[in-house]
């Protein structure tokens, strides 16, 4: 949870590896001279005691395949199948710019013009995704891919956070039947 002191581990959900109270301690342990912004998510290397990566786009790909050789890793699915990579990459770029980052561009716009531009792009893209899901259960292909999970992170917060706080309020996800059902389907997956 993030408070005035930064990202902190809750007492009832402590850091089980290092006992850190704040995520900034992980950044300092990785690089004592670190002076940048502490961000999440973070992948921590327990052997070398350092942050390996903190970029969500990289992490989803790393977690998809980098550990496949380890015993006990379920390799029965691939979130980034070779035959769909070009389409996934194109959709990820659009979703990131217009939706994932679009809610922030809208919410933190400093001019009316910037607000309207990002607002219009956000809801145009949501409309296109709603139409896309009218003929397909998933965004790309016939199984869940990284494109679905990258959109999920914004959709799951959209109605409770972005509609009111960021003024992304043309329509709620709950009012878009395909996106709403899609979000519900992803949310009900084991481990979510």
Question: Which sequence ranges carry the predicted segments?
Answer:
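C-terminal alpha-helical interaction module
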Residues: 1-192
